């Protein structure tokens, strides 16, 4: 069994890597991938904590987080596809220029 500190440290490292990718990257697809990494890191923390205390609540929260991540990914990819068809780019700087 993995110690609680090691599992939570791994989850924290993954979360920080996802947050760094979200802040640094300018491509919307990579930003969506970074967001998925952050969601999976938080789900990993739930599983590690549930395993440590012998509760199945962590696994239930993991299933909920994966369901949320799948819904977010499908909606995000559909929006990115439409955006790419209209603007021919996924660069956040180009997309943020609004007409009005």
From Swiss-Prot:
One GO cellular component term noted in the UniProt record for this chain: plasma membrane
Name of the featured protein: NADH-quinone oxidoreductase subunit K
Annotated EC: 7.1.1.-
Pfam families attached to this UniProt entry: Oxidored_q2
Membrane topology: Multi-pass membrane protein
TM region positions: 4-24, 28-48, 60-80
Catalytic reaction list: a quinone + NADH + 5 H(+)(in) = a quinol + NAD(+) + 4 H(+)(out)
UniProt-recorded Gene Ontology molecular function terms: NADH:ubiquinone reductase (non-electrogenic) activity; quinone binding
Similarity comment: Belongs to the complex I subunit 4L family.
Domain of life: Bacteria
Lineage: Bacteria, Pseudomonadati, Pseudomonadota, Gammaproteobacteria, Enterobacterales
